[in-house]
């Protein structure tokens, strides 16, 4: 693995699996006993790497399973021998129905045509396939409405001979705000709807769930049979308005590079495209081989910083597709080959995803998701490299 780390000197995301487990334990201790956790690992675990993170959770009894965005994401997990339940949180397209039933992947259902297509295919395959029903209580995205038509939909789903209505859920749109009035309204609407459906059909849903990360932290009454942990799994806060004393989170992601060139220039020299920065004194400049093609955004031009030898170095000029420059005049000891911390800790300095997200006009988890496929991920357990994910090693080109 030492050779691998040297191979990834240009840029590398370090993923701390111990931090993932720490964050899970914090959530488990915070929620009610018996409440399960669904680990939301869609979008390749918010850019962190879904498969190795799922491997870490496979034997945890309080982790019910995983939430993903598509059947393709679910199949990536199944192909990696992940056996816990997987819920596709969004719409599933008809081409995938046989696959998801065969691979025991649970779809979210909120359309009658989908309901009956799944029932017909499951019957043809001679299996009973679980589904979760999505209820729209205020997100206005997908889901049945919590009204009489919605009650009729649930009744229709329960009548499908080849489907098992395992769960029902909704999603908060404002749980990360200080004012929880809207979120509490969603919760009450959802609970009333679930109660009505259960009473009218003499049925008990196995999994009733609505809490996202903000709900887990701030809304204990919403932590029902299961919670869906996304952003906090990776040590990032849903917003500045949630109670940060409720749980202790450890950031999972660090981003590292190395200096490839150091030069001294006089005052009056323009730096990078369009000369948006001009040196005002003799300046020592270091070039870092990372750019917006790696997910390090152009918005950090002339505003962001990195850490070298435990000291901050400001970005000067525009971030290019593959490189950017920093002012290291105040770090005279730095040299070519020295490590550069783009995200994470070096000495007493720490750059968070939240900081870079704010500077670049992104949410913290948006920033993490945009770290590109050119950036390899190395996964650490107990401080030692455990495995790596490298797009250039894994890619297979198929002719169509």
Where are these regions (language model features)?
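Active-site-proximal beta-alpha core segment in soluble small-molecule metabolic enzymes
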Residues: 2-7, 11-15, 19-22, 29, ...
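Active-site anion/phosphate-binding pocket segments in diverse small-molecule metabolic enzymes
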Residues: 2-21, 73, 92, 99, ...
């Amino acid at each position: 693995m030492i050779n691998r780390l040297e191979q990834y000197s240009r840029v590398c995301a370090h993923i701390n699996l111990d931090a993932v487990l720490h964050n899970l334990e914090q959530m488990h201790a915070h929620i009610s006993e018996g409440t399960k956790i669904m680990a939301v690992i869609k979008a390749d675990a918010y850019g962190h790497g879904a498969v190795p993170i799922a491997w870490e959770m496979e034997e945890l009894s309080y982790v019910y399973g995983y939430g993903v965005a598509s059947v393709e994401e679910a199949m990536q997990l199944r192909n990696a021998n992940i056996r816990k339940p997987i819920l596709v949180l969004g719409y599933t397209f008809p081409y995938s129905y046989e696959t998801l039933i065969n691979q025991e992947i649970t779809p979210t259902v909120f359309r009658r045509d989908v309901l009956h297509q799944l029932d017909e295919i499951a019957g043809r395959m001679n299996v009973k396939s679980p589904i979760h029903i999505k209820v729209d209580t205020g997100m206005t995205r997908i889901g049945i409405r919590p009204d009489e038509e919605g009650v009729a939909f649930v009744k229709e789903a329960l009548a499908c001979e080849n489907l098992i209505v395992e769960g029902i859920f909704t999603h908060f749109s404002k749980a990360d705000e200080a004012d929880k009035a809207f979120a509490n309204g969603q919760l009450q609407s959802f609970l009333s709807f679930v109660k009505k459906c259960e009473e009218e059909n003499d049925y008990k849903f196995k999994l009733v769930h609505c809490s996202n990360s903000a709900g887990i932290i701030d809304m204990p009454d919403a932590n029902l049979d299961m919670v869906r942990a996304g952003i906090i799994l990776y040590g990032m806060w849903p917003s500045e308005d949630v109670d940060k004393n409720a749980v202790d989170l450890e950031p999972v992601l660090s981003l590292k590079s190395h200096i490839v060139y150091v030069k001294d220039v006089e005052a009056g020299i323009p730096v990078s495209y369009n000369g948006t920065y001009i040196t005002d004194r003799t300046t020592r400049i270091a070039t870092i081989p990372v750019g917006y093609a790696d997910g390090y955004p152009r918005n950090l031009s002339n505003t962001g910083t990195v850490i070298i030898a435990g000291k901050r170095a400001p970005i000067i000029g525009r971030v290019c597709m593959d490189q950017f420059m920093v002012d290291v005049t105040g770090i005279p000891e730095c040299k070519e080959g020295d490590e550069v911390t783009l995200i994470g800790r070096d000495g007493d300095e720490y750059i968070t995803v939240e900081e870079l997200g704010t500077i670049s006009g992104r949410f913290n988890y948006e920033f993490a998701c945009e770290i590109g496929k050119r950036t390899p991920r190395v996964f650490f357990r107990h401080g030692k490299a455990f495995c790596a994910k490298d797009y250039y090693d894994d890619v297979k080109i198929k002719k169509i």
